[in-house]
Amino acid sequence: MAIYADNSYSIGNTPLVRLKHFGHNGNVVVKIEGRNPSYSVKCRIGANMVWQAEKDGTLTKGKEIVDATSGNTGIALAYVAAARGYKITLTMPETMSLERKRLLCGLGVNLVLTEGAKGMKGAIAKAEEIVASDPSRYVMLKQFENPANPQIHRETTGPEIWKDTDGKVDVVVAGVGTGGSITGISRAIKLDFGKQITSVAVEPVESPVISQTLAGEEVKPGPHKIQGIGAGFIPKNLDLSIIDRVETVDSDTALATARRLMAEEGILAGISSGAAVAAADRLAKLPEFADKLIVVILPSASERYLSTALFEGIEG
């Protein structure tokens, strides 16, 4: 029987859908990660970080999970914690969407909001402070550096893309939050399956820290509206050596593209999904990518952004 022991085991096997209004002659397909158990790509890493912590004895019954989140990883950790019987405290910048905050509280999270201007660095610092207050009680899973993050994408997301495209994938486009998706998928296809695809990282034009780092420039993070990517620093889980190209997208374009995905493709897409598709659409129309199969990761669905600029001016 196909019955899961708990909801954490139901991750993955999300569909690929060909876009009709983006790209060149149907060469852009999207992997809809909002079909995961708590409705985002982060379900994969939430489950695997908890599983691995249990396996290595770091996380045992009676201990409490702590981490910093911009929302989706927190929701993923929270659903896994609820399913497996753990208490959980999460820190999050106060600027994240109302939906994310309410979902976290609904899942039983002790939610600690941090100053929005300090971004994810501020949330991480607060999480570390909480853990330091009682190290025997708290376990911090550290999504930005935990190897279980890219590992699950190497074991699941990458092989799914390979299988569902019959190995014909040429380009993978993904926004960078923790760096786990693009790193794990690229390692799977390039190293395990042996195909030298083009790995494209997407970041906000307002906070182009990956581009600045690769160019040897001073890193100058900035505020933007693309929740879930552009943390303002280079995460340890981002393997820069496996990235072939970096594309920047501004917040307004990301928002407009996410709205187009809903209205023109019937795909409920969040803001970072809009950024990734905008980057892929731009690439797909270049001569060198015209005949390439481009797979884009759509991290989450639009319901998580009802109170944000994504739905500004849209009334029922």
From Swiss-Prot:
One of its GO terms (molecular function) is L-cysteine desulfhydrase activity. The gene is cysK. The modification N6-(pyridoxal phosphate)lysine is found at residue 42. GO terms for biological process: cysteine biosynthetic process from serine. Hydrogen sulfide binds at residues 7, 35, 268. Keywords: Allosteric enzyme, Amino-acid biosynthesis, Cysteine biosynthesis, Pyridoxal phosphate, Transferase. The lineage of its organism: Bacteria, Pseudomonadati, Pseudomonadota, Gammaproteobacteria, Pasteurellales. Disulfide bonds: none annotated. CDD domains: CBS_like. Its EC number is 2.5.1.47. This is Cysteine synthase. InterPro entries: Cys_synth, Cys_Synth/Cystath_Beta-Synth, CysK, P-phosphate_BS, TrpB-like_PALP, TrpB-like_PALP_sf. Homodimer. Pyridoxal 5'-phosphate binds at residues 72, 177-181, 272. Gene3D superfamilies: 3.40.50.1100. Belongs to the cysteine synthase/cystathionine beta-synthase family. It catalyses: O-acetyl-L-serine + hydrogen sulfide = L-cysteine + acetate. The keyword Amino-acid biosynthesis applies. Its cofactor is pyridoxal 5'-phosphate. Pathway: Amino-acid biosynthesis; L-cysteine biosynthesis; L-cysteine from L-serine: step 2/2. One of its GO terms (cellular component) is cytoplasm.
